[in-house]
Amino acid sequence: SVKEKLSDMKYEYEIEAEFDYIFKHSGQSHAYAPIVASGKNACTLHYSDNNQKLKKGSFVLMDIGARVSGYAADITRTYAYGEPTKRQIAVHEQVKNAHEAIIDMLAPDLGIEEYQRNVMEIMGAAVAELGLVKSPQDEKVMRYFPHAVSHGLGIDVHDALGRPRYFQPGMVLTVEPGIYIPEEAIGIRIEDDLLVTEKGHRNLSRSLSTGW
């Protein structure tokens, strides 16, 4: 896997090239322009240069998905390059815990507005736990979590879900919490692709390790 080969790579573009090879060797293609962002580059949400040298002791964020049979995947993992600091591990753990808590909520008939409120409570608590804001309700939470947690996924990477009031079986969406701390050069996001089922949900990308 790319995670196992990461320590042998020196530049962001080498990681991108590894995915290029894997996808083309399988007769598939990228669903969108890949993001390979190390260190502070991960704080730029749609970073696309993918040309910086990897630095030991940093995290590498990889937002990459294949297009297979016309359908897109959209997956993000953030892995350590070298030995991470306690602070980096703490941020990663908060994102991982939030990711799991948000996924656990997904079920048919869950209200979209309720989902959004719960997401902000979870992310607010995570950001506050890291000492970045004074309380989970602080408006500055959005400084460290500045994007939506989910979008529809299908033929288009950002597929339209319509305007439903509740989640419904058959919907496919991403769950992608992240915490970005530019002043500490830490940007961590974990993203999976979820199918809402009759009884709950199915994680379509669960086989990929979410650990650091």
Report each predicted region and the residues it spans.
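Active-site neighborhoods and metal-handling regions in enzymes and metal-associated proteins
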Residues: 1-212
